[in-house]
């Protein structure tokens, strides 16, 4: 059996536990409903890599995507809901989350990509996009913005060192598209090939003076008193769910939570995110 730690109804498996399990695992059936025993272990709960062999033995909901305060709130409410299911969140970027959804390695993908991008990455599968929140994205800069960075054109200044996001993240997709629209070559941006795998690590790079500027969501800048934030655009966070799953137990509980006024109020107070469209569903 795969050893795990249970936090409410959230199932957390460390990468070390998963590796040990995969070394001795035999094949099974995805979605077979076989329960995983919850046992007490000495490992600290960690996000695990999403593995096919693990999914074959999973009985809960696999959510692919990067974490956020709003998602943590949602998962906490799923734990308390009478119809909620155990949730394992696998931390990955937008592209990989949707890739996992397409190949049935995940049940839900959290993504901030545009609707057209989502449709193209998950072709032939009817999806429901459940809107979570809208949030501001822009540049992390040193306090006082000494390099006077206000637009993507300013990234070409030879004195400016940029910390990029990894390919497949919504931030990278947006930035690359913007560079193409403005006719700006990435070769003119010092540090373009330097990649961070989260907004937190991007902001840390600027805070620690390893870069002059990075691109990420506004809320993360609040954790770094030595940083300022320059807004560039707004992004919408969606939960992409196969349409056939929405009315199933567990999934319907998730939709109910997101559409509740309590959830909208708590998200707004906790994060300042725009909840004007929270709970709305788009069929694609």
Predicted regions and their residues:
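Short helix-loop capping/hinge motifs at secondary-structure junctions, enriched
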Residues: 143-151, 184, 244-250
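Ligand-binding cleft/hinge of the Venus flytrap
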Residues: 73-83, 153, 165-194
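Short loop->beta-strand "edge-of-pocket" segments that line small-molecule binding or catalytic clefts
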Residues: 56-67, 153-173
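A ligand-binding cleft/hinge motif common to bilobed small-molecule-binding domains
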Residues: 110-122, 203-233
